[in-house]
Structure formats: C-alpha cells, structure tokens
Amino acid sequence: MAWSITNKADTSSFTKMAEIRAHLKNSAENKDKNEDIFPEDVIIPSTKPKTKRATTPRKPAATKRSTKKEEVEEEVVIEEYHQTTEKNSPSPGVSDIVESVAAVELDDSDGDDEPMVQVEAGKVNHSARSDLSDLKVATDNIVKDLKKIITRISAVSTVLEDVQAAGISRQFTSMTKAITTLSDLVTEGKSKVVRKKVKTCKK
C-alpha cells in the first residue's frame, strides 16, 4: 500500500516519520471491530443460486375422445344398417307402419319389447330417408344458385369484351385519321387550312 502525505502550511500534527509510524501502530492496535474491512468473526451466509421449482405439467382436462369415436362408429353402423335395409326391403310405407302397430296391439305375449324395436327401426329408417331428401333439396338449391352466378359472370365478361372492342375500334379510327393527315401532307406538301367556328357566349 502506498502512502502519500501532502505538505500543508500547518504541519504541526506530525513532524517526524517516527511519530507517523507510532500513530499508525496505535491506530492499527486499537481499531474497532466495526471498522475492520474483513472481520473474521462475522458469519457470511452462503449464497445459493436460486433454483426455480420444476413446474409439474398440468394434467389436461379429461376429454371424452372415446365418445367421439363411439359416435362415429355408431353413425357408421346406422348407415350400414340403413343401406342393408334399403337393399333387402322396400321403403316402409304407411301401410307397413299401420300393420306393425296392429301387430303390437294383437300381441299380448311377454315379448312386448320386440315389436317396439321394429317400430323404432322403421321410424329411424324413415327419418334417415327424410334427411336424405332434405339433403337432396339443399344440393339442388345450391346448384341453382351456382348456375345463376355463372350466368352473371358470363354476362360481365361479355360486357368487358364489348368495352375492350370499342376501345380498340376508337384507337383504330384515330390511327386511320393520323394516317390520312400524314398522306395529305406528303401529297400536297402542306396541310389544309381549316377555319374553326368560334362559339360566342351570350351574356
């Protein structure tokens, strides 16, 4: 450590190096513990790096994926059932439904569940047919609307073609006028003087 002493006008406090040494020795021996830069008896707490807690991933909400699969499988089974019933038997009419209801009324045995199942199957088949007819009506309406859109688009395209043709004809007529004036200048040597009528404004 380097010590530097500045010479001041008032040097009455220390006159000799021996006094400086004695003063430093006394101050070093009689120093306070609070003044020590590196005290030995002070316990320094160990600084551990803060570790983030390992976040446990949240469990996703229990989704019923199996139910979707089951619904799809049920729909496939119902469609296959409808296809097989359509192939094997004609569509149930009103008379078939009346006969099945009459059979239910006449049958007094313990097997009451079987005729009800047959009636419900007939209703399901009938509702599937009504759904198919609704789908057919919707597709027919969509086809009609598409045809209307196509006719409108074709009308717009023909109008645009007519406009382009008119623009081409205008350009062609202006080109022919320029060619005729050029030919007149070549043959006669100078352009004809044409007097333009000036319109007078009435006040």
UniProtKB/Swiss-Prot annotation:
- Establish whether keyword Protein biosynthesis is in the entry: yes
Keyword Lipid biosynthesis among record annotations = no
Protein name as it appears in the record: Late transcription elongation factor OPG110
Q: Which GO terms describe its biological process?
A: viral DNA genome replication; viral transcription
Region Disordered, residue ranges: 25-100
The family database entries (Pfam families) matched by this protein are listed as: Pox_Ag35
- Origin organism is Vaccinia virus (strain Western Reserve) (VACV)
Gene this chain is encoded by: OPG110
Q: What does this protein do?
A: Involved in the co-transcriptional or post-transcriptional endoribonucleolytic cleavage that generates sequence-homogeneous 3' ends during late transcription. Involved in postreplicative transcription elongation on intermediate and late genes. Also involved in DNA replication and in multiple steps of virion morphogenesis. Required both for inclusion of virosoplasm into crescents as well as for maturation of immature virions (IV) into mature virions (MV).
**Taxonomic lineage of this organism?**
Viruses, Varidnaviria, Bamfordvirae, Nucleocytoviricota, Pokkesviricetes
For this UniProt entry, what's an example GO CC term? Answer: viral envelope
Basic residues: compositionally biased ranges: 49-67
Bias (Basic and acidic residues) ranges:
25-36
